[in-house]
């Protein structure tokens, strides 16, 4: 109900929606109905993430809201994120069919491997596996995600190890007085999924629950003309859930406690090769604001992970296989993070904080030859880290100057590698404890001009410490064996970027461009030691240096009220500069990094009908360090259309890989390919 005696303009805003401005005539007395339209990409690009550490450089952020998640056509969150420029997983794989160890994330061409070179946060808590750095994307219930922000570019000055290529910050839904959202779908390849999110407030207290059950029969990874008796569909069955208890701490603060659980069982494409994972997590956090003291945030978290996997050797004709290794990888982590931020007048903002983490894990293996046990192998260790950071941002008229840095110190201890053969003497090795330190500074400058133009420039250093998986765990994919290396050193990056953004035509058109350059010393790569038709042997080693440089271009346009189109282009030149141990690798392309990536999104949104499509082109890349195993270029399109049958119920149909492109996923050297056309139909229910 609105009552006014004079003419005026009423502005209403809500997260995820465009601000509505309505002219209110004089002498208005009665109800006023206002409809909020979903926020455009133009607005979303400029939204600062919930974690205040993420810098507000407009040329390097990409945001995805709940509406776009629904319109993407993708079932898993990693496939939704592929619309972000530079986002990629190891071996082009996805959460529906990939082994967990190949779901490490990379941004901006720094090179993908099993261990992510980007940090993934869920409400400020790291989501990367503490043991291996990869991400279990199916831990995230679709309907419980409010938004995702992707920051391209090194951010170790704020986040330390893991943020070598950038940060992905995922925010869950905000708890309201009472709500329940449910999505259920079913499709071909025996695929079905149900996701839900709900909660209720009781005075100052609140409780929220979220969960997801996903199952797919999957598809056969090997091309039809190369299949044998051992080849089966690569499917998965996942179950995840969480319960969150929250309490308001006065008008300016809140605290929460979240308990989560995740279970997954996968078939990896042959009769013998399977894996399963069990994860529990406990997160405790509090946020509090005070006009005089500033904003405070604290997180305390812990988790345990059990990852089990079988490896096999497949005959050349793929008619038989034999078990070679059965692994069990238990790991645990505990960590904390504290952050403080305060504005000084209207022209300065300072922030500081510290965080620490303790990770323990090992790989217990049973090796086989001709179905007989040959040895018991166990290797693992412990990694403790502590970091302190600070940042100062000063505004002078239309200039913004930011400088800061972070100091990290970590220690690898209790490292061991034991082998007890059935025949022969045991080998027991203890590794010397090692400590490393990294300083990660950053300087940034932003200039905002009239008419919606802004330019930015940044220079920085970053690092990534090797994971316990890289240090101590061996693995096998196809006929490729990759050995661990306990002597690995931290990767260290030096880089910079410059960017320009333009917002015009009444905020309906947004253009941006970014030039970036980075050099990574001691980059960890899988280096080929020997190659035969039956077996390729590799080891994780520190390369001398690699260089990644390129161009990012983005354009977004909203027109005719309901339509929006967007496109992104990433050109990356990522090459090996120096490797004294093997000069033949110098000048070659970094594995798993395509030179060209093009994305586009189209959406139509109105009260009843909604439609969205996203396309992706990826150019040729190589699967190996010697550039002898190419993966050819491909183009694919995902889409979704939905219709609201009432205010609370919406029906939808979703398609993945509409082009039917069986693009190449990996070459080990056996070729594996991507999924066929995937179709789902389902319903979304929202009760509020």
Where are these regions (language model features)?
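Short acidic/polar hinge/loop motifs at secondary-structure boundaries
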Residues: 2, 125-152, 173
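Short, acidic, small-residue-rich periplasmic hinge/interaction motif at the N-terminus
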Residues: 13-18, 27-71, 78, 513
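Extracytoplasmic beta-strand/coil segments of soluble accessory domains associated
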Residues: 78-129
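Periplasmic-side early beta-strands and strand-to-turn transitions of outer-membrane beta-barrels
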Residues: 157, 169, 177-179, 183-185, ...
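Conserved C-terminal beta-signal and adjacent last beta-strands/turns
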Residues: 199, 247, 457, 491-496, ...
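Face-selective signature of the C-terminal outer-membrane beta-barrel domain
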Residues: 246-262, 278-423, 430-431, 446, ...
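Membrane-embedded beta-barrel scaffold of Gram-negative outer-membrane proteins
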Residues: 296-311, 362, 448, 454-460, ...
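Gram-negative outer-membrane beta-barrel transporters
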Residues: 395-401, 410, 510-512, 516-520, ...
């Amino acid at each position: 109900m609105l009552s006014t005696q004079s003419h005026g303009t009423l502005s209403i805003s809500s997260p995820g929606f465009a601000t509505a401005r309505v002219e209110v005539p004089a002498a208005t007395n009665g109800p006023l109905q206002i409809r909020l339209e979903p926020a455009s990409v133009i607005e979303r690009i400029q939204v600062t993430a919930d974690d205040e550490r993420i810098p507000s450089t407009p040329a390097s952020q990409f945001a995805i809201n709940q509406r776009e998640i629904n319109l993407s056509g993708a079932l898993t969150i990693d496939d939704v994120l592929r619309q972000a420029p530079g986002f990629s997983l190891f071996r082009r794989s996805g959460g529906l069919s990939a082994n967990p160890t190949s779901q490490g994330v990379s941004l901006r061409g720094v090179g993908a491997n099993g261990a992510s070179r980007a940090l993934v946060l869920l409400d400020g808590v790291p989501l990367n596996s503490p043991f291996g750095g990869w991400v279990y994307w199916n831990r995230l219930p679709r309907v419980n995600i409010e938004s995702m922000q992707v920051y391209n570019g090194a951010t170790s000055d704020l986040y330390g190890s893991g943020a070598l290529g950038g940060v992905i910050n995922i925010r869950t839904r905000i708890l309201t007085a009472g709500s329940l959202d449910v999505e259920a779908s079913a499709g071909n390849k025996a695929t079905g999924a149900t996701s839900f999110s709900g909660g209720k407030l009781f005075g100052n207290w609140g409780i929220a629950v979220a969960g997801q059950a996903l199952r797919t029969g999957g598809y056969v990874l090997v091309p039809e003309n190369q299949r044998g008796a051992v080849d089966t569909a690569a499917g998965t069955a996942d179950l995840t859930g969480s319960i969150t208890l929250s309490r308001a701490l006065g008008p300016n603060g809140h605290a929460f406690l979240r308990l989560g659980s995740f279970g997954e069982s996968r078939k990896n494409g042959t009769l013998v090769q399977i894996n399963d994972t069990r994860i529990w997590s406990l997160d405790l956090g509090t946020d509090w604001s005070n006009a005089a003291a500033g904003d405070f945030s604290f997180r305390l978290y812990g988790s345990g992970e059990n990852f089990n996997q079988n490896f096999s050797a497949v005959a050349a004709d793929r008619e038989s296989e034999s078990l070679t290794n059965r692994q069990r990888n238990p790991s645990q982590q505990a960590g904390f993070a504290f952050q403080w931020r305060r504005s000084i007048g209207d022209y300065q903002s300072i922030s500081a904080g510290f965080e620490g983490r303790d990770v323990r894990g090992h790989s217990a293996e049973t090796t086989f030859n001709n179905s007989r046990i040959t040895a018991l192998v166990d290797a693992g260790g412990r990694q403790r880290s502590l970091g302190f950071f600070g940042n100062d941002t000063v505004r002078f008229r239309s200039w913004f100057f930011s400088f800061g840095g972070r100091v990290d110190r970590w220690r690898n201890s209790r490292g061991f590698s034991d082998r007890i053969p059935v025949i022969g003497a045991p080998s027991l090795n203890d590794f010397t404890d090692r400590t490393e330190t990294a300083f990660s500074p950053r300087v940034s400058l932003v200039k905002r001009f009239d008419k919606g133009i802004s330019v930015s420039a940044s220079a920085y250093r970053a690092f990534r410490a090797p994971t316990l998986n890289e240090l101590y765990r061996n693995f096998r994919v196809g006929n490729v064996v990759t050995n661990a290396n306990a002597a690995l050193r931290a990767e260290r990056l030096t880089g910079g970027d410059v960017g320009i953004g333009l917002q015009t035509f009444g905020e309906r058109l947004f253009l941006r461009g970014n030039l970036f350059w980075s050099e990574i010393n001691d980059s960890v790569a899988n280096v080929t030691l020997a190659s035969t038709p039956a077996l390729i042997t590799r080891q994780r080693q520190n390369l001398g240096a690699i260089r990644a440089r390129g161009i990012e271009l983005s354009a977004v346009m909203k027109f005719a009220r309901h339509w929006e189109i967007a496109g992104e282009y990433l050109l990356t030149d990522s090459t090996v500069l120096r490797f004294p141990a093997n000069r033949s690798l110098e000048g070659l392309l970094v594995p798993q990094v395509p030179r060209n990536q093009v994305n586009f999104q189209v959406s139509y949104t109105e009260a009843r009908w909604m439609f969205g499509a996203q396309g992706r082109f990826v150019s040729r890349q190589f699967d190996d360090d010697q550039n002898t195993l190419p993966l050819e270029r491909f183009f694919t399109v995902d889409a979704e259309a939905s219709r609201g049958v009432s205010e609370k119920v919406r029906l939808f149909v979703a398609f993945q890989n509409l082009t039917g492109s069986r693009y190449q996923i990996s070459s080990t050297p056996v070729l594996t390919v991507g999924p066929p056309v995937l179709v789902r139909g389902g319903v979304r229910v929202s009760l509020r």
